[in-house]
Amino acid sequence: HNNSRDIDIAIEKNELQRIRPQLISLIEQCGWHIVTYLNSDRLVTWVCGTVHENNSADLVQLDFFYHTSIFGIVLIENKEIIKHRLFNGQVYHANKVYEFLDKYMYDRAVGATYPDKYKNTRQLVENNPQVEKLIVNIFGKNNLAVCDKANKKELLKAALKWNFHRFGWGTIANFLQFEYHHIKNYLCSNTGFSIGFTGPDGSGKTTVIDLLIENLGDVFRKAHTYYHFRPTLFGNLGEVAHSAGVKKDVDRDFSKPHRGGKTSALSSLIRLLYYSADYIIGYFMKVKSMIRITRIVIFDRYYTDIICDSRRSRIYLNSKFLHTYGQIFIPSLDYNILLTASSETILARKHELDKEGINTINKKIDYLANKKGYYKVLNESTPQEAVAKILRIVFEEQHQKNLKRMR
């Protein structure tokens, strides 16, 4: 039994391609989904997730390594790891020598030190002849102590020399393959995803978001970014106007989101254009850079909130116009969660709210619910049940997207 949430698998590239259909079929038969998928020159990553009948969620990351390399420079060939593999009665696994060298050689090649938390593994193998042989052959250093003090430039130079000796002009092909995947993943990849939450006060957004992050924590605890309403590339409109001398006083009573009075169509349009600039520029500077590398961006309220809650955004424009405008100009998130509940349930949670305001927001939510990319989720029971509904939507949609990307 393996409790790890990150499993490294050494496999030849053509072998993974051969068994991939069977692997996907097995994942689906077990009720799991491929949530994120990354393809690079040295590995393929699948983050797989499932939601159980009791509404709990599990995630596991599978890294299929073709070889240990950096910038297309091979440090350890997979065939060597597989050749010296061991069998524990259930599965084949790398021996301690290659378990150590895989991490150590990569860390040294990027200029990092071998983590102290793995010192027991190092102590087990540091005097092993196999370790010394690879350090001499690849890095040109007589032992680990010398290699520890070497800078990454001289180590990479030695590794590159060995690559030309081992692969000849194939070394150039390896580098070009690295560059191809690097540029493609930077410009075209969308391996992560974004989620936005919209709903009336009392719908439980904060609790559900916190629980969602907790449920995704095994793999995405350090791989998610949280924003409130917009990317905030630009400051609050009132603060900007105050700094420019256009406005004398700034209302900073954020405990009352619906405190402002109704604004004119012109004022609403100015606000919309200002926020649009933040959404558009901020998306490509802050959001896109995250979701292209298997990470998650979460918004507590997004542009959808402008459509649903005019009193909060103080943008009093027609809902259909705002939706059409958003489709044309505002970068869309992958999943727009319309989190709500009945007015009776919300009023039971927050007595200070007014039923008319809740119903107005819920009507706009119903208008958006059938639009592409919008998902209405009722939070009438426990927050975990709502989170489970959301994760089932996301996992299934991501799985279908990733199957298409693998074709």
Predicted regions and their residues:
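Short beta-strand-centered segment that lines the nucleotide-binding/catalytic pocket of NTP-utilizing
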Residues: 219-237
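A glycine- and Lys/Arg-enriched "phosphate-lid" helix/loop adjacent to the NTP-binding pocket
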Residues: 301-367
